[in-house]
Design a protein with these regions (language model features):
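Acyl/amide activation-and-transfer machinery of modular secondary-metabolite enzymes
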Residues: 1-12, 53-76
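Small/charged-rich amphipathic helices and low-complexity linkers that mediate inter-subunit docking
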Residues: 1-19, 23, 31-34
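Hydrophobic "lid/gating" helix adjacent to the active-site nucleophile
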Residues: 19-56
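Helical lid/core segments from catalytic subdomains that handle acyl or acyl-like groups
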Residues: 62-104
Length: 104
């Protein structure tokens, strides 16, 4: 499914707060998705597991035009989530590996 979403207010809010628009929207999407139990189901082996929360992830661009992956610990406080996500992106940016799950 594809839908058009008017993000004008969110964009302005991000500018007013001085935060990343993409991280603000990511937080809101994850908050909405986590409220739907079915979105928290995962298949592990031969059973279905329902998680209490979701682990948002994003790609992080590097100066050499490659990218890395970053996983962000969810926090219900939008500004706390954004601050931690920015720090995680900076930590992952110079990483030579495609995936670094050392935080887990």
């Amino acid at each position: 499914m594809t839908v058009n979403v008017d993000c004008t207010r969110a964009y302005q809010e991000a500018k007013d707060k001085g935060v990343s628009f993409s991280l603000l929207v990511l937080h809101r999407i994850v908050t909405a998705a986590a409220a739907v139990e079915e979105f928290r189901y995962r298949i592990e082996g031969d059973r279905v597991v329902c998680y209490d929360s979701l682990l948002p992830e994003a790609t992080v661009g590097r100066a050499d035009h490659t990218f890395s992956f970053a996983a962000f610990e969810y926090d219900p406080d939008e500004l706390v989530f954004i601050r931690r996500a920015k720090a995680e992106m900076e930590r992952c940016r110079p990483n030579a590996y495609w995936w670094d799950a050392s935080y887990r």
